[in-house]
Amino acid sequence: MEVVEILKELLKFKSITPDDDGAMNFINMFMDGFDADFVDVNGIKNLILTKKFGDGVHLCFAGHIDVVPAGDGWDSDPFEPELKDGFVYARGAQDMKSGVAAFLCACKDATKFNGTLSIILTSDEEGDGIYGTLEALKFLKSRGNLPDFALVAEPTSSSTFGDTIKIGRRGSVNGVVTINGVQGHAAYPEKCVNPVHQLASVFSDFAGYELDSGSKYFGASKIVITDIRGGMEVVNVTPKSVKIMFNVRNSELTSCEDIKRYTEHIFNGFDFTLSLKESSKPFLTDESSKIVIQAQKSIENICKISPDLSTSGGTSDARYFAAFGVPVVEFGVVNDRIHAINERVLQSEVESLYLVFKDLIENFE
């Protein structure tokens, strides 16, 4: 079956995170000739497919089969793919069943390869993302079979197919600062300790502050305020406390400890508490890595353009490969309609993505 037909079959599965809706079984049957391991954790389905061609490098393709809910307002059934004007319309068309279809077909058709090809698929990426790719990699490590290189087929292209490869991602740290005061009557401010006034005195040194100046592939790590709450929504009572929520998308130059240290410095002298949660660490694959160089060459061979190397965007499962020391890149179709109503992907992009992956496999040594 050609790659677009496989994509259409995958799009029929109502695999709203974390349910795979049977997609994993379909993929396992389609990929005959590959050894299969189902790694199911806490109700999450993960599938690892492996085929050894020779004693060379182990190259892994990875992706997720789960999608976000479709919502209302679609022009067609979001789980009945429709081909119109060269586009395939359905939930998951761009994010990321197109990438999955492309690497499934490229791996299935592979003949010229002197190593091991593997595929990691999960139904837990759009949700919590903690029982998916991470667990699959733990399983492979326990078997002594971690890949040497990996490609995650997320939709990375910005405006033109082939224009962007992701070679890293910023980290993400969420924080909550609560300043405690003394509640009282607004007419007697001298008898109160107003935490909002305390916040106001330091707010300009906290909101939007750049913790570093960035680097070649990362912008500055900036404190972004996401919410401020305090008081009882009445005009004559001062607040007992004020809560400030913030997020930092951090580069490799700023750690969670650095964020903690700066926040404590700013609010020093106040009665406050601080809670930080690091949901992902920043990572960067060296631009001289074999996976980066060969991905660039394959894109240039098929797309006739030179892709930019980028670390923009949110978090992805590529971070788990980096955590295990596996050099990883991300590459896929244009991402202009991900998570949107009437999500769609160009049929020609899916076909070209298959050719890029096929070229990568055939020329990877």
Curated annotation (Swiss-Prot):
GO terms for biological process: diaminopimelate biosynthetic process; L-arginine biosynthetic process; lysine biosynthetic process via diaminopimelate. Keywords: Amino-acid biosynthesis, Cobalt, Diaminopimelate biosynthesis, Hydrolase, Lysine biosynthesis, Metal-binding, Zinc. CDD domains: M20_DapE_proteobac (cd03891). Pfam families: M20_dimer (PF07687), Peptidase_M20 (PF01546). Zn(2+) 2 binds at D95, E126, H339. It catalyses: N-succinyl-(2S,6S)-2,6-diaminopimelate + H2O = (2S,6S)-2,6-diaminopimelate + succinate. Belongs to the peptidase M20A family. DapE subfamily. NCBIfam families: dapE_proteo, PRK13009.1. Catalyzes the hydrolysis of N-succinyl-L,L-diaminopimelic acid (SDAP), forming succinate and LL-2,6-diaminopimelate (DAP), an intermediate involved in the bacterial biosynthesis of lysine and meso-diaminopimelic acid, an essential component of bacterial cell walls. This is Succinyl-diaminopimelate desuccinylase. It comes from Campylobacter fetus subsp. fetus (strain 82-40). The lineage of its organism: Bacteria, Pseudomonadati, Campylobacterota, Epsilonproteobacteria, Campylobacterales.
